[in-house]
Amino acid sequence: MSRRCSVSGKGPLVGNNVSHANNKTKRRQLPNLRSVKITMEDGTTKRVKVAASTLRTMKKKAAQAAAAN
């Protein structure tokens, strides 16, 4: 399984751990993925991995669409 958001495509980033002595070692910064059920247009549900920031945006867009109706 890849550690990638299925909606936005966000994936791991590479950075450094930096000690007080300024020693640097490589590290990976992983996205905050959540497994959520999404209802498709035909009524079926599908479980996908979505980044928490993307999930927040999706909820905001859904609330705006509901308020517009």
Curated annotation (Swiss-Prot):
Belongs to the bacterial ribosomal protein bL28 family. HAMAP family: Ribosomal_bL28. GO terms for molecular function: structural constituent of ribosome. Residues 1-27 are annotated as: Disordered. Keywords: Ribonucleoprotein, Ribosomal protein. The lineage of its organism: Bacteria, Pseudomonadati, Campylobacterota, Epsilonproteobacteria, Campylobacterales. It comes from Sulfurovum sp. (strain NBC37-1). It comes from the Bacteria. One of its GO terms (cellular component) is ribonucleoprotein complex. One of its GO terms (biological process) is translation. This is Large ribosomal subunit protein bL28. PANTHER family: 50S RIBOSOMAL PROTEIN L28, LARGE RIBOSOMAL SUBUNIT PROTEIN BL28A. Pfam families: Ribosomal_L28.
